[in-house]
């Protein structure tokens, strides 16, 4: 892991956290001393801070608004004003503490129990690392992280600090995902060896190079903090902030990172896929100097035999590419939904569903109607956010998109991005997940991790 050693204060606090946790068996201490890992009574409201409050951040905060929104942190004052201007946010106006720099917030606010991180992808892990060292529970908007090494880091550090973790792929908590799992486990599809996943994204710029020049930085925006851990570049209006960063490699994870957490998630979960052993890809042209992801890509993931499950080949399509329409699908029916979908192909039946695992159906419809659905075997969820809150208040409860699961799912998607970058080599990448390395491409191995700008490393 390429980490920045600049800050010693968080390392010292991590050691204090370990010592304090050991003493807690004998002492009664305020919960902020133990950070977010201390006991919180179910009747208490959690002190939640949010880093990144526009877009998905605003939605995540609203979903947790029955708790105490203790602090908001964003590099753009305008996004903070927009969020606090919402009707549901009225109780927090004038009470919620406001920050631009997450490091200052964590330094100054020990009463924070939990953090929602909804920044661009490249900042998820640096913020999470600082928060976990203080014992703060974490909800990270999908995709979980920016590199394969970060996926491993987050899962490991969450275990070490005993925090409650959740990735924000909300479809993972919905009914459809549970039905898909139950039907696959029931044998409705038979042996599955083929999966197809597709999306209508990107709906942001990709396949372009970096424009020259710069624009005046708005007075409401701290551009240096926005760039954060990435190599610094000049500000350009509407080029990166506040939505279009997704296609830029320094900041986002492209289409498979952005939407794979909603689409690959369900077959990945139902088939218990773990990590692929082979990955290959083809794509349209990249942006100049690999600045942005391509406009369209097709990625093949090959998963080995596991127990009684045969090997599985999962193919991802984006940028307008789609799998061949099944002959058994009725002509009047849409394949998936308007945003994308999944086909899980078994030797008995094929299951089709939309994005977020919604509307799962065995096709054709006559086969679906004839199938005797099993009784529920998987606990139903109160929702992706409430799962997290409930698990913080009652540690006997579990989140379902915790960093162990979501880290491995994210690693798989990020391996797909690496295969896309290396597609010009015309080879199938062979991946040794146990040792986190490609065995046949040293160039691909350099893409598993990244460097961090001073002050933003993982301590």
Language model segments and positions:
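C-terminal helix-rich "cap/oligomerization" subdomain common to oxidoreductases
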Residues: 2, 18-41, 292, 391-459
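Non-transmembrane alpha-helical segments in soluble domains
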Residues: 17, 61, 81-84, 103-106, ...
